[in-house]
């Protein structure tokens, strides 16, 4: 399930885990020691997150129901709580530095594509070929 910034024609992640149940949102990335460069956690519904108990900083992208960026936090360090983003419906937690690398800004349109796991290897070689 890749996440693409359609406005900037850049990728945020190619390996995304969806957390849409209470327990998966609560646990989040707590058991992880790091995120790979193309990994992300997509939490829904969510308007705020915390990094209490986490071991590494993350970038955070807040999205509306139609996946428009409504908030950004770069380098949120462990043991912090984000602000509450009233217009957000979901949150994407990404490796530190992803917001800068992807040039993502508030107002950008993001696409989260459902892709079969077997298709993930093909995506790495054809990045952005489907974006006009």
Q: Each predicted region: which residue ranges?
A:
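Compact, glycine-rich, soluble single-domain proteins
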Residues: 1-132
């Amino acid at each position: 399930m890749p996440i693409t910034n359609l406005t900037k024609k850049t990728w945020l992640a190619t390996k995304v885990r969806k957390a849409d149940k209470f327990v998966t949102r609560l646990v989040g990335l707590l058991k992880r020691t790091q995120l790979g460069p193309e990994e992300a956690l997509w939490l829904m519904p969510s308007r705020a997150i915390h990094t209490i108990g986490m071991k590494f900083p993350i970038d955070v992208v807040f999205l509306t129901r139609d996946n428009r960026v409504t908030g950004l936090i770069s380098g949120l360090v462990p043991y912090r709580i984000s602000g509450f983003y009233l217009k957000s419906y979901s949150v994407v937690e990404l490796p530190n530095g992803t917001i800068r690398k992807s040039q993502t800004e508030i107002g950008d349109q993001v696409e989260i594509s459902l892709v079969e796991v077997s298709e993930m290897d093909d995506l790495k070689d054809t990045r952005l070929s489907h974006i006009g």
